[in-house]
């Protein structure tokens, strides 16, 4: 039973003491990593907006924070994946992190599950796009997963469907309908994870009742929620934990923790 934890939208910057929206991005990301690793995940995923200022130093800061958290927690082997958001520089993200970890587009396998990490970054814009090349790559990976008898989680930054917030829906995934039409044709696809919206969100990919759409809170700051927070903590940082079962079902729960900041190292 692989365990997956999703974190999203840390918005790190080059300076360790740098603040974004009035908060210490690094300190709050360090706390999120500690919370995540306490749950002993097999897979740890960061779904975009990794580096707010898109600097080389910011991605080094991200890499060092993850390395330090793993060492401090004496964590068991965990596979890490990252995807680029609108506040990212995909080439720098890959250059700094890609030697050791999976950077979108990429594949992460755990037991009878396959995690497909996709980039929705579009240069110069806040909205996202998958594009024909990645859609073709996705279908190739899904065909292989079906052959291998694996269930599939797909992860990206931008929500592939409207979430019910007018301002957010204008900067969602421009080819989201095309992506979802493709994914719904593959019975093995059971979950689509995304960030960008800085809040908990949960839905289904109709008419598929077995295909969940899950939006993740930010580790930095929350936006006004569309849906009630099931934990009653809509304004706290958070993440999402998913236990991926052998029968293709998913047991997931929202994670929240205090916004109290640690001293940045």
Swiss-Prot record:
Its cofactor is Fe(2+). It is an enzyme of class 3 (hydrolase). Pfam families: Metallophos. Fe cation 2 binds at residues 49, 86, 157, 196. Keywords: Hydrolase, Iron, Metal-binding, Nucleotide-binding. One of its GO terms (molecular function) is metal ion binding. AMP binds at residues 11, 49, 86-87, 198. Fe cation 1 binds at residues 9, 11, 49, 198. InterPro entries: Calcineurin-like_PHP_ApaH, CNP_phosphodiesterase-III, Metallo-depent_PP-like. The keyword Nucleotide-binding applies. Its EC number is 3.1.4.-. Coiled coil: none annotated. Binds 2 Fe(2+) ions per subunit. PANTHER family: CYCLIC NUCLEOTIDE PHOSPHODIESTERASE CBUA0032-RELATED, PHOSPHOHYDROLASE. Belongs to the cyclic nucleotide phosphodiesterase class-III family. This is Probable cyclic nucleotide phosphodiesterase SynWH7803_1390.
């Amino acid at each position: 039973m692989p365990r997956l934890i999703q974190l999203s939208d840390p918005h790190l910057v080059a300076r360790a003491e740098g603040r974004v929206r009035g908060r210490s991005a690094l300190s709050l990301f360090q706390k999120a990593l500690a919370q995540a690793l306490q749950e002993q995940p097999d897979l740890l995923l960061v779904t975009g907006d990794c580096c707010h200022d898109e600097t080389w130093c910011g991605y080094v800061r991200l890499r060092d924070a993850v390395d330090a958290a793993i060492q401090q927690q004496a964590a068991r082997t965990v596979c890490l994946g990252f995807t680029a958001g609108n506040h990212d520089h995909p080439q720098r993200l890959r250059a700094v992190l890609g030697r050791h970890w999976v950077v979108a587009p990429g594949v992460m396998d755990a037991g009878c599950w396959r995690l497909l990490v996709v980039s929705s970054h579009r240069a110069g814009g806040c909205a996202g796009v998958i594009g024909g090349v990645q859609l073709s790559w996705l279908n190739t990976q899904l065909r292989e997963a079906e052959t291998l008898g694996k269930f599939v989680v797909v992860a990206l930054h931008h929500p592939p469907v409207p979430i019910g917030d007018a301002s957010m829906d204008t900067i969602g995934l421009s080819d989201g309908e095309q992506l979802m039409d493709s994914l719904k044709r593959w019975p093995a696809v059971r979950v689509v994870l995304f960030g960008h919206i800085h809040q908990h969100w949960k839905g289904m990919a109709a008419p598929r009742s077995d295909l969940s759409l899950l939006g993740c809170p930010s580790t930095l700051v929350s936006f006004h929620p569309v849906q009630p927070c099931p934990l009653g903590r809509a304004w706290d940082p958070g993440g999402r934990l998913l236990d991926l079962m052998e029968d293709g079902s998913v047991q997931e729960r929202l994670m929240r923790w205090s916004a109290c900041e640690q001293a940045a190292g």
